[in-house]
C-alpha cells in the first residue's frame, strides 16, 4: 500500500490553477441593489496592506489566519496582518508612494470592524470600485469576486458576519488582453480600491431596483416608474415627488411593478440641469434619488434633446 504523501508547506508555490477555487460568487448587475438614500456605514480609512506579487494570499489562504497545523505545531507564515503598514482607502496605490507608481500586480488589504445587528436585516458589502480584480474574504471565508475597475460591486454578507470581523480584499491590477486597459495601450493603469467601501443594511424584503423616466412619446407629459423587490411577493410601494405634487402607488406582483402617470416636470438641459427629489417606500424600506427628466431621440443624422437638435 502506497504511503500517503505529506503536503509540503511550500508546495502551493507551484500551483498554476490556484485561482479556480475563487472563481465563484461573482458580483454582477444582478447582485446589485439600489443604494440611493440608504445609510452607509463606511469602512474607509486605515487598512493594513502588503504587496503580494505571487498571490501568496490566495495560494496559502492567508485569510484563514491559520498559525498552527493539524498537529498543533506552529507553522512558518509570510504575513502578520496587524503589523503591516497602513494605507488610507479609498485610493489608487500608484499615487500613494513613488515605489508603487508603476506596480500593477496584486495587493492585499485587511482591517477589522465591529457589527451589531439592529433588527432582522440583510447586510450588503459595497466596494465602490477596485481595479481590476477584487476578491473578498470575511472571517476566514471566501465571499466572492468582481471583475472591472469602474463599476461598484455588492455582496450579501449577512451569513458571514460576527460581532467582531476580519475583512480581507485581494486586489489584482495586472493588465490582461481582455481587460480595459489592455496590455499595450496609452492609458495609465490606476490600481487599488479607489471608491468607498461600505456596509449597507436593508430589511430582508427590500427595494432592489428602481427606475423613473419620461415616457418616450414626445409629449414630455408622462412619467413611468418601475420597481422590483428582493422577494417575489405582492405589495404596494409609494412614489413621492413633492415638488411636482406627485404621490402614486406602485402595485407590485411577484415582486415587480410599474406605474405611468401624468406630470409636467421642467426638462433637464445642460444649461439648466433641473433635478427633482424622488422617494419610494415599500414597507419599512425607503430609497431616494435626484432625477433629471429629459428625452433623447435620433432623427436621421440629428441627435435631439427634448425635441431640439444638440448640434
Language model: regions and residue ranges:
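Secreted/periplasmic carbohydrate-active enzymes, especially glycoside hydrolases
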Residues: 1-311
